[in-house]
A protein has these predicted regions:
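A residue-level marker of the well-folded mature domains of exported/periplasmic proteins
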Residues: 6-8, 15-19, 28-365
Length: 365
C-alpha cells in the first residue's frame, strides 16, 4: 500500500444512519460530513489514502495515561471499536501508552509499523519529536491520524479542537468577571505539550492586554489531585485570587478553595463532571469548555474513512461546546451518577458520536 498525494476535493461519508446500543446513541457513519469533517481553515487541503478492503488493523499510540482524561479517551476508543456497527471494519485495535516519554513513544510506533498495522491513531508526547517516525510510517504505507496533542508533520491527519481559542475564551471570561483587574491563578496542563502551549498562549494573549491583571502559574497536569495540591500551595503561600484560568483538574481547584475556607472565584476551565456538578450546586461563575475524549473515536472514524478511499481535510477542526451556569443541564452535560473526575464532554454530536456516561465509566481499559 502506498501513500497518495494530498488532493483538493470534497469529503464524503462512509455510510449513513444512527446505531442504537449499549453505548447510548453512536452514529458510525454519515451525520452530515460537512458538519463533522470541517477544514481547519480555508487553506486546508483535502487528503486521500490508498483504498484497502476492510477489516483493518489499527493501533492507538497514547503518550500518557496519568490522568482521568487519558483513561477515558482509551475507554471511548475501545467502546467505539467494539460497537456492532464499527466492528466489521476493525480486525484488531492495539492500545499502548508511553509514559509521556518521546523516545518510548517512538519505539512504540516503530513496533506498530513493524507489526503491519494499517493505521495508527496518536496522542503525541511532542508536537515535533515524532515527526520523523510518522514520516517513516507513511513511507511504509501506514496511515497516521493525530489528535489532542497533535504533531506538525504534514504526513499525518490532525484532528483537534482549537486549543488557542479555548484558552482565549477562558481568559475573556475571566476578564469579564474581574473587570480586567486582579490576581488570576493559571493552572496549566502538562509542560511542553501542544495543548498546553496553545491554550496558554490563547490565555496570555488576552491577559497581556490588561495591565491590571497579575497572573500566577502552576502546573496541574490536567489531573484533579495534582491541580488541588498546586492550588492549595498557591493559596497557602499568600495568594488571594480573584479568578482562575484552568486547563484541567478544575474539581481539584474548587476543592482547594473550599478546604482553605476561601470563596470560590469565577473559573474558566475544562469539563470535569465534578466541576460542573459543584457549579450547578453552589452557583459560582464558570465557563466550562471541554476537550472531548471522544476525539479518539473520531480519529478511528477518520482512519477508516480514509482507508475506504474517501477524502478528508488534512487538518480537521472539531467544534467547541461551551457550557455556562445558564446552560448546565443534569444528564446532558453533567452526570450525578458518575465520578467527579469524569470528563463530561463525551459527545461530538456533529459527527454522530454520542456516548452514555455510565457505559464509559464501566468500560475496562
Amino acid at each position: 500500500m502506498r501513500r497518495r498525494d494530498f488532493l483538493i476535493g470534497a469529503a464524503r461519508g462512509i455510510g449513513s444512519g444512527v446505531v442504537l446500543g449499549s453505548l447510548g446513541q453512536v452514529a458510525w457513519a454519515d451525520t452530515g460530513q460537512d458538519q463533522c469533517f470541517v477544514p481547519w481553515n480555508s487553506k486546508t487541503p483535502m487528503a486521500s489514502w490508498h483504498k484497502k478492503k476492510p477489516p483493518y488493523r489499527i493501533a492507538l499510540s497514547n503518550s500518557y495515561i496519568g490522568n482521568e482524561w487519558r483513561t477515558e479517551m482509551v475507554q471511548i476508543a475501545k467502546m467505539y471499536s467494539e460497537h456492532k456497527a464499527v466492528k466489521p471494519f476493525i480486525k484488531d485495535l492495539k492500545i499502548s501508552s508511553a509514559g509521556n516519554d518521546v523516545n518510548s513513544q517512538i519505539a512504540q510506533v516503530n513496533q506498530m509499523i513493524l507489526s503491519g498495522v494499517d493505521a495508527i491513531v496518536m496522542d503525541a508526547a511532542s508536537p515535533t519529536g515524532l515527526n520523523s517516525t510518522i514520516d517513516k510510517a507513511a513511507r511504509a504505507g501506514v496511515l497516521v491520524t493525530s489528535f489532542d496533542n497533535v504533531v506538525t508533520t504534514k504526513k499525518a491527519i490532525t484532528i483537534n479542537e482549537d486549543q488557542y481559542e479555548m484558552g482565549k475564551r477562558w481568559a475573556e471570561f475571566v476578564v469579564k468577571h474581574t473587570g480586567g483587574k486582579g490576581h488570576v491563578l493559571m493552572v496549566r496542563g502538562v509542560a511542553g505539550t501542544f495543548v498546553d502551549n496553545k491554550r496558554y498562549k490563547g490565555g496570555k494573549d488576552i491577559f497581556d492586554k490588561h495591565s491590571g491583571i497579575k497572573t500566577t502559574e502552576v502546573y496541574g497536569k490536567w489531573d484533579n489531585g495534582t491541580a488541588q495540591k498546586v492550588t492549595a500551595d498557591a493559596l497557602a503561600s499568600g495568594g488571594g485570587f480573584d479568578a482562575v484560568w484552568c486547563e484541567g483538574g478544575d474539581s481539584g481547584v474548587v476543592r482547594a478553595f473550599q478546604q482553605a475556607g476561601a470563596k470560590v472565584p469565577p473559573i474558566g476551565g475544562e469539563a470535569e463532571n465534578g466541576f460542573r456538578k459543584l457549579a450547578a450546586k453552589e452557583d459560582f461563575p464558570i465557563l466550562s469548555i471541554g476537550q472531548s475524549p471522544a476525539l479518539s473515536a473520531l480519529s478511528i472514524k477518520v482512519a477508516i474513512q480514509m482507508l475506504q478511499g474517501h477524502k478528508v481535510p488534512r487538518s480537521i477542526s472539531v467544534p467547541l461546546h461551551p457550557v455556562t451556569n445558564k446552560t448546565l443541564k443534569e444528564g446532558k452535560n453533567y452526570f450525578p451518577g458518575v465520578p467527579d473526575s469524569f470528563y463530561a464532554a463525551i459527545n461530538i454530536p456533529e459527527c454522530g458520536l454520542n456516548f452514555d456516561a455510565q457505559a464509559v465509566v464501566n468500560q475496562k481499559v
